[in-house]
Every structure is written in C-alpha cells, then in structure tokens.
Amino acid sequence: MNFTSTIGLEVHFELKTKSKIFSPSPVTYGAKPNTETNVIDWGYPGTLPMVNKEVYRLGLMVALATHSHVNPVTHFDRKNYFYPDNPKAYQITQFFKPLAENGYVEVEVHGKKKKIHIHEMHIEEDAGKNTHGTNGFSYVDYNRQGVPLLEVVSEPEMTDPDEAVAYLEKLREIVQFTGASDVKMEEGSMRIDTNISIRPAGQKELGTKVEMKNLNSFEHVRMSLAYEQKRQQEILLSGGRVRLSTRRFDTNTGKTVLERVKEGDADYRYFPEPDLPPYHIKQEWVDEIAANLPKTADERRKIYVDEYGLKPYDANVLLQNKESSDFFDATVAAGADPQQAANWMNTQVNGYLNEKHAELKDIALTPENLAAMIKLISDGTISSKIAKKVFAETVANGTDPKKYVEENGMAQLSDESVLAPMVKEVVDANPQSVEDYKNGKDRAIGFLVGQIMKQTRGKANPKVINKLLLADLASR
C-alpha cells in the first residue's frame, strides 16, 4: 500500500533588536542568568508593556521578502498557560490578527521547482529558559523572557523530508539576508516545530497529526520526519491508529519518543491583550521598507556569477551567510578583483575563522585591507608567497598591508633594468644549463630562476625573471 505524507512547519526566528519587544531590557546572548530582565517582563502589577517599533520593521522585511500580504491593522492577544518559564501565566502573541498572511517560498527539490505557501506570520514574546540540574533542582533564567520572536507558519503542503528541509534552507536564507535575524540555530535564534500525518494514497481526509518540537538542526528535521513516516506507516499497515501526540527526536537513537498524548487541540483561551491597542501599519511605511530591502541571496548570486564571472560553487560559499557576502561586496567595492577576493575569502579568510572559532566581526581584518593586499599581488608588488605573510599580520592585528610591506622590505623586485644584469650574470655563469635548455630540458629554466632568486633573497618577481631569461637564452 502506498501512503501520502503531509508536513507542516512552524519556525520561530529571534528578531535582531537591541531591546525586548515590550520592555527596555537589553537582548544579549550568553549574559549571566537573570541580569537582563525587569518587572515588565515578569508582568508585575501596575506595569504596562510598550511595543518596540523595530520589531514590526524587521517583521515587515520578512513579510515582504516572502511575498506575504501585510495586514494594515494588527493586534496582540493573550495566550494563557502556566509554566515556570512563563512568569505572567500568559504569553503576548498575535492570534486573531497576525502581522502578515498568504506568502510563499519557492524551492527546488529533485530538479523541480515548487511554491510552498505561508499560512501566516506573527510577532510574539519568547519565554524564559528552564535548566534542570543534576542536584534535583530546576533553575529558570528570565533573560530570554520578552525577547521578540517572529513565528512563520507554513501551509501543510510538503510531502517528504527533502521538501521540508529545502523550505527551511530557503526560509533561513531569506530571513538572514533581510538582516531581521542572525538565524543561529546553536544559539536558539531559529527554532523549528514540525507536524506530520500520513494517509493512504488517494484518500482526501488527512491522517492524524503528530508534532515534534524544538528541532535544532536541518538534519534532525530530515531524520525525525523520515522516522515518523516509517513509524506511522507500520502502525496503519498493522491495523492500528496513529494517536494525536507530541514526540521528541532522540539524537542518540535516531528515533522519535512519545512525550504526551493529546485528546484534542489545547485551549489557550485566547483573548485580545487589554494593555495594548491595535497597531496600525501605514502603507507609506511598508513602501519605504520595501524600497530599502537588502539584496536577496538570489540577487547576489546572479551578480556574482553573471557579472563577476565566479563559479557557482564559489558564489554559494560566499552566500553561506550574510556577513561573508557583505564582506566580499565591500572588498570588491574597495577595488579588489572579484575572483581574487572570492579566492581569498573562501580559503585563507574562512580557514582563519575556522581555526579561531571566530566570526568576521570578531577579527581585525577589514574589507579595505583585504582589497589593498589583493591589489599588491595584482600589480606585482608582492608575490603570493609573501602575501600569506602579509595576510597573517593584517588579519591578526589590522595592519595596513602596504605600510607593512614597505616597512619590512617585502616588495618584489620587478625593475627590469635592475634584474637584467643579474639574469645575464647567472646565465653566463651556468653554460651547462644553457646547453641543457637548448637540448629541450626545460628544467634548466627552473635552476636558473632559483639562482636569481637566491641572489635577490627571494624578492625578484618570478614573472619578470622568466621573461628576461627566455629573452636572454633566445639571443644566444
């Protein structure tokens, strides 16, 4: 018997604001527990929330980038539930009138393009974080309480794990390149909930839905959905029934584990947030945001390949994150050859970042200095070998490449009037090499080049030496 899978995804993005959604508390990842929170986050009596306008601006950028319809009037609602990491016993979210609806993301899977539609996206506040100690105690950190989130809810249109992952990869790329979120899954800036049901092929009625919460990698999404497909098929083939439930993915076994069985959808008793008025979004503001949207990854990819002549692979490496792409763009804008800039970014720069477990913003290298160093190579001032020494200094200390080369006498000797007598002297002193060259032994050239490099302590420009050598040998 054949089965059809129906998959839906809910993705939470932590929006990149300096302060929280309803309070002035700062947002800093990794801060000491309970140092970035206040009475508004806790919902103390007499406190009132105030909406951070930047949250709406970032949310609108994502809405526009995903072709979503922006609702001109939105409002917040209370989602009522009790849990230790939720000190107010309710969450402020958007249930009845979300930020935007009816968008889509276009993906390509197995060589076929498909539009996966977005049901809606809404703004809400995050909860705190529970940590369960080995001493029998549980601890709550409220630093995350009130951090702004954008939840993007897909239509249940995906039919296999590959489609789900393709959608997530594309959505992550879109959100990252708007600048709305840093989408760092390891820091909780992007969190994924999935739901999947299966039914016999041809049956219109959907099967019973199983949810999986807080999956923290695309590979875990793929593995958990594939496992659920198989598990649910085996249940139906054996005459059983799939139960409405929430499960978690066990990374050690590669299986999903039951967390709780549900008798129906939870009743959170939503009602309009009484402390916040409706939020009106003016079309002029939407138009202004649309006009200033950053280039998407697809737009940048087209420029890199079609205009700069980069190979698609090199372009995709640069586009793995917005920070890298922005740095590359700035390097080219500073005058660097695009291909050389891509080569250095994808090899030496990325190698240094991996070695130091750092990001571009953490190191001393600037696009201007990288461009200056590339120009020193292009104009023959330094060799590729010397460039690596210059790069090591520049990336570590932010030293100006040109100044460093001048102060340390690292410039190549390219003056033909200076090198020509040296070439003649070396050729005159090595008649056997001349004879070998004339007899077709090209390795003789390498020996002669080596002798000249020895005389100049490695500073002679190899291209100029080769040119002069060939001219001298041809005249004999």
From Swiss-Prot:
One of its GO terms (biological process) is glutaminyl-tRNAGln biosynthesis via transamidation. Gene3D superfamilies: 1.10.10.410, GatB domain, N-terminal subdomain (1.10.150.380). The keyword Secreted does not apply. Coiled coil: none annotated. Pfam families: GatB_N, GatB_Yqey. It comes from the Bacteria. PANTHER family: GLUTAMYL-TRNA GLN AMIDOTRANSFERASE SUBUNIT B MITOCHONDRIAL AND PROKARYOTIC PET112-RELATED, GLUTAMYL-TRNA(GLN) AMIDOTRANSFERASE SUBUNIT B, MITOCHONDRIAL. Heterotrimer of A, B and C subunits. This is Aspartyl/glutamyl-tRNA(Asn/Gln) amidotransferase subunit B. It comes from Lactobacillus delbrueckii subsp. bulgaricus (strain ATCC 11842 / DSM 20081 / BCRC 10696 / JCM 1002 / NBRC 13953 / NCIMB 11778 / NCTC 12712 / WDCM 00102 / Lb 14).
